[in-house]
Amino acid sequence: MTRHSRSPARVPADTRRLQTLRRRTPVQLAVGLAAAMSCLAVPAHAAPAQADQQYDALIQRARAGDHEPALTALRERLAQAPTDRRAAYDRMIIAGWAGRPAEVLETYGQLGDAVQLPADALAALARAHRDERQWDASLARYREGQQRFPARQDFVLGEILTLADSGRSADAVAAGQALVRRQPSNADARIALAYAYIRAREPYEALYEADKANTLAPQRNDIVREYVRALQHAGLPEAALRIAGERPGLLSRMDSLSLQLDAVAEQVRLADKPTRTEAERFAIADRALARYDELMPQLRALGPQGEGELRRARVDRLAALHARVRMREVVDEYESLRAEGVQVPAYALTDVAAAYLYLRQPEQSERLYQQALSEAYPPEGDTEARLAAQTGLYYSHAEAEKFPPAGDVVQQASAEQPLWRWVQGQPAAQPNDLWLDAAQVAAQSRLQADDTVNAQQRLEEMVQRAPANSRLRVALADVYRARAWPRRAESELKLAEALEPRSMPLEVQQGHAALDLQEWRQAEMLRNDTLARYPEDLAVRRLDREWNVHNKAELRIEGYRGLANDSAVVGNGNFGIESVLYSPPINYDWRAFGGIGYATGRFEEGNVDYRWARTGVQYRVRDLTLEGEVSTHSYGGGGRAGGRLSAQYDIDDRWQVGASGALRSTGTPLRALKQGIYADTLSVFTRYRASERSEWLFTVAPSRFSDGNDRLEAGVTGVQRFYTAPHLKADLLVDLWASRNTRDDTPYYNPRSDLTMLPSVRLTHTLYRRYETAWEQQFLAGAGAYAQRGFGTGAMMLIGYGQRFRTNDVFDVGATITGTSRPYDGRRERELRIVFDLTYRF
């Protein structure tokens, strides 16, 4: 995500931050204070010299910052002699030094409005009005001082500062510029103008003036101090720290810590920017976090004085933790701040929202992204930051399965980004990179909503317009994989590899494609490489998870149970179950497996119990899957040996061919087994899979029964999607089968020839989905015809309902209840059965 400024500009604290007039004690003030001190309660024998010594001591202490003794003495004097104006003036001046504007105004109020103040007292009064935000009164006093004391520049400077503080920054800048034009070598004038520029939000102009002032008076600490603060406001805290470090004591402890926090915040802003090498990508964030660990205890030690800066440090530290991908700590610190009643600024909420999203708490993330967009990133603000927040909000909606608002967000984001933008200094409009980012997210949003056709169309158009953009090619490859075209995805990724061979998203997608293509060694290499380089990345972790699941053992269980039927063909109480256990991969390409099965049924001639066991090996490499097994079968009269071989070969992404042959096939009808008849089968198929929405299977399967009957079956089955929504899919299913037998006098159902035509519709509705966990229900309904030689044609009807549950990539279970009505030998028979399956990896 794009980084942004983590803290608003910090405004100096008026006169305490801008001491352009050094504290001097004019001759009039010295005389006045001496007179005041001489009138204080002292022993009768005390000489005037003693009063002078007392005065000198009090003044020295006041000038050193210990104002209270002098103020106490002056208060006592005024209590004894309320009309002593000289004491009142002195009290106003020293109270101004002490930063007590209320006492200055109180003392002046006791004098009356008609009195004409001396220059220093008038300056103290003007500053007091300014400190109390009484702008008009302050300006009036400063302008009075300019008229009465034209030689005193502090009144001119004070007017500039007051104009700046009152929000009249343009007037302040104009007045400051006029003063600088009159006195270009006056460092105080340039500092005042710099202050006005800061309030006018022109930090670089302010830095220029402060730099000029520093050149004019490098020996003055007050000038250097304001130069340091100008650097701070211009976003150059490291330079400010370097200059401040050259003069120990230049800044107060609090100001020094504040400047150090600015420097760390600058590091945070750079923390997730691209780095020269992958190994360095966390270096800046680690340095920033280490500095926070040093500074925050110091701020806590300051007590209430440091509370504001401590809160700022904790808020800015959220961004450093985010850049370091320590997302749990981001959330914990945010919740701690909220529990303490701290209002976290809106600009910091995007990092917290991203952390919640990383931790799979999209509902919390949604709320924070929405708040950040409304409060920190309005449409007329920072467009890059706004798009980043909109993208985060989209993913929050999508991962919370709220697709309508997710679509609204990406549409709004795309609408706000023009294709071209004008850049200052460029004669022609420039391509807007943010438009491309928004368009890519919009295209990928269609993939997230299962609208793969639209996603493919959009991304292919973008790739045609920007063929050298590897990110677009990687995104397009992801769509191709979702469309069940792994080879096409692989080709697209090869083109992207030529552009950015070490790109992490590229290698992750190549890893997924390698798993789809059964390129196990390549998948492991890509997984190992990306995991070593980016162990914290969620996409890398997803690839790692899929690789780990692939390397687990696998248990498959399938079964059926007749619930109610009046069919003599399938038997009453029919039940069957088979379980197969596959080992983890052996030397990448091999898996051993073993399984057992059982089937039973009741017929007119009696019950039959069929048991079998099998063991074998599976070989899987690119484009080819082979299986071979030996088996034993028991259905009365002892065990009998059997075997099976199968092969599947992928010609390309769409076409697949395969064949299998079995001795003593487990597909032999139970009624035939009851009579000791078994079947050897051969099956050849061709599969055409246009995409994930369309698949057709053409099968020819001859069988030879041990009673001399030869059966030939051929069929076409197909699935064609005709409606897609995020939580609802509708498919048309087609079953078209024909068979022919050489005998019709068998004890099992064996029509001379028949034809089955059964189109049906399947609706799949997602009841619940949360990342790798999904719960679906299916509705199935179909109507067709069954034609049997010698018995005519009759209607077929099918209705079904099922549910499926998947979780954690390793557990998948489903069950479907179906009811069928169809003719057998001209007689209509009905059956209600349940079919179930389970897959578990461990």
Regions found by a protein language model. Give the residues of each.
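Boundary of Sec targeting at the N-terminus
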Residues: H45-D52
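Gram-negative bacterial Sec-dependent N-terminal signal peptides
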Residues: T2-H45
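Gram-negative and organellar
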Residues: A51, A57, A62, E76, ...
